[in-house]
Amino acid sequence: VFAFMDAGQVNDGHVIVATNAPRETLMDCSDAEAAALMRAARRIAIAVQAAFAPEGITVLQANRPAGWQTVPHLHLHVLPRHAGDGVELVWPRKEPGIERLRELAARLQP
């Protein structure tokens, strides 16, 4: 795992954390690789909090273009956040009801 400053700097302190191995999505990596990625993200988030004192931190990981992935290499963003920073992540809530939630959960069972 390695980390570097995002060239786009959505907010000061925006860091990318990525796998060394050539993995395209989260589904392509091992449990150990996923755990290493999240451990590194946690360490970076702690450092970002100490260095930039953001009001919050968003950790974002996307898979495939329909999932907002723009670079075909497994990575995540550690993004310092401030009220009114203009960063938005919006999706419609559909409120499907408890029975539909049970049906959806059942599909995930082995």
Placement of each model-derived feature along the sequence:
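HIT superfamily nucleotide-processing domains
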Residues: 1-110
